[in-house]
Amino acid sequence: MGYIALFESVTHENLRECVETEDLVLFVVNEKKMGNIFKRNPNVVSVLKERINKHIIMAEASRDLLTMTRNLLFRYGVREIHINWKEGQTDIQVSVAPEEIGRVIGKEGRNIKLFREVLARYFPVHSLSVKQ
């Protein structure tokens, strides 16, 4: 069973996007649907992790870049987000707790690349960086 079909069968919600890496699956759900998912099944992340055998990240989509960035990195305890628009390019700097920086960046920068890639699908994002 594919990840999208599995997600939709477990959550009973349509999925907006699914992105996979070696050890992680990122599910992006439609706006205002995350609450419904957790009301029906509070253990949805555990169920998906058990069936897929990879780390699971769920994020709620948004039409607003700031909100989408916060939703995508929510589990890492986002403190601040700075967005610079310059000459048609958008650069984002995210501040997280010092102990979470390694997890946000990921092994060989995989996680931060994945997050930037997902944001770039919805917004004209040039770079995404993490600071203390």
Per-region residue spans from a language model:
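RNA-contacting regions in translation and RNA-metabolism proteins
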Residues: M1-Q132
